[in-house]
């Protein structure tokens, strides 16, 4: 399985949804970097399940155990490995999936790829549970970036077609339901509650911005910042689309509308607009990096769905049990921040090598 990301900062995520533990090994962080474990725990708690009405009932503390790479609160240059114990699993809920794949999940494709040897319980290595170790890596990178004057912030841009209002700024949206407009948030929560009541689920979009990233990060073509960030984001289960700046909306504009005019502000080169999302030719231009990630509705729903029996190769109805989110978007916000932070810090390390 391909569960390793990065070049200068390299992380490998391991474990399954119902294995004894899940975790991450991070290589490339310079020795001597302070890691605030209390701050890391606060970040992980934003993603943790079982805290509210729009989350899965599965409760996990998501408390990281640092096994290596950290001495007296500072990185020591060795690979940093951390795990999170899985303490609230119910593998019996997935017993019928051996022959009947869930629509919208990776059950069928995993069966084809791994010949039935894959761990099916809770989705195994394909589970959103694996975003917890991603958030360990991302939470550490957020601390390292903050010391460089770089902030990564996100919000819920939309859920079930209901859009947030207002602008995302460099101030973190410190809310359990991270929207700028509380009125819009109430409408989104109502849509989630209705979907849950109807045995269904809804999706949405997370918007993320990186403030303070210097110009010059990234490379042309396949090493571009869009490529690096998108690769990390698509490692989050349920992400089905990523756009930067004006994104697909740019296709509706004329060049005279889409081009970001250059200007000077306090002796610094800036652009008057930011349709490019802070990236030109795969390289950051010093403006905020702005992106949006689209999340599909949670595929595990309470309604009976059409599937097939893989043994008899016949159509078969499937009723899914287990504990699932009616909408994963609120818990995905820190996951997006984590993925983006990892990608930006990896690019920052690359830039340091180039400019030595």
Describe the role of every protein-language-model region.
Residues 10, 300-356:
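Internal helix-turn-beta structural module
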Residues 113-221:
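Glycine-rich, mobile lid/loop segments that gate access to catalytic sites or pores
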């Amino acid at each position: 399985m391909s569960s390793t990301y990065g070049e200068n900062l390299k992380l490998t995520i391991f474990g399954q949804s119902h294995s004894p533990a899940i975790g991450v090994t991070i290589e490339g962080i310079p020795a001597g970097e302070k890691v605030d474990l209390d701050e890391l725990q606060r970040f992980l708690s934003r993603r943790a399940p079982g805290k509210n009405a729009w989350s899965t009932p599965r409760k996990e503390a998501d408390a990281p155990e640092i096994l290596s790479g950290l001495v007296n609160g500072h990185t020591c240059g060795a690979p940093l490995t951390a795990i999170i114990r899985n303490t609230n699993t119910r593998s019996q809920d997935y017993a019928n999936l051996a022959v009947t794949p869930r629509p919208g999940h990776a059950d069928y494709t995993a069966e084809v790829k791994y010949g039935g040897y894959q761990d099916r319980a809770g989705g195994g290595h394909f589970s959103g549970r694996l975003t917890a170790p991603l958030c360990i890596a991302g939470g550490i990178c957020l601390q390292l970036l903050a010391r460089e004057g770089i902030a990564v912030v996100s919000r819920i841009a939309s859920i079930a077609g209901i859009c947030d209002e207002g602008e995302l700024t460099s101030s973190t949206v410190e809310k359990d339901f991270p929207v700028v407009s509380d009125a819009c948030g109430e409408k989104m929560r109502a849509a989630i509650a209705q979907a849950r009541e109807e045995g269904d689920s809804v999706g949405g979009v997370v918007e993320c911005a990186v403030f303070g990233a210097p110009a010059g990060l990234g490379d042309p073509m396949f090493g571009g910042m869009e490529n690096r960030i998108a690769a990390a984001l698509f490692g989050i289960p349920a992400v089905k689309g990523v756009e930067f700046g004006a994104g697909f909306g740019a296709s509706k504009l004329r060049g005279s509308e889409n081009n970001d005019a250059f200007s000077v502000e306090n002796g610094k080169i800036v652009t008057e607009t930011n349709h490019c999302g802070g990236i030109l030719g795969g390289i950051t231009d010093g403006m905020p990096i702005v992106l949006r990630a689209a999340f599909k509705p949670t595929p595990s729903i309470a309604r009976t769905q059409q599937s097939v029996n893989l043994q008899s190769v016949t159509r078969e109805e499937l009723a899914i049990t287990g504990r699932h989110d009616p909408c994963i978007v609120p818990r995905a916000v820190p996951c997006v921040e984590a993925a983006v932070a990892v990608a930006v810090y990896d690019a920052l390390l690359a830039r340091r090598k180039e400019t030595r």
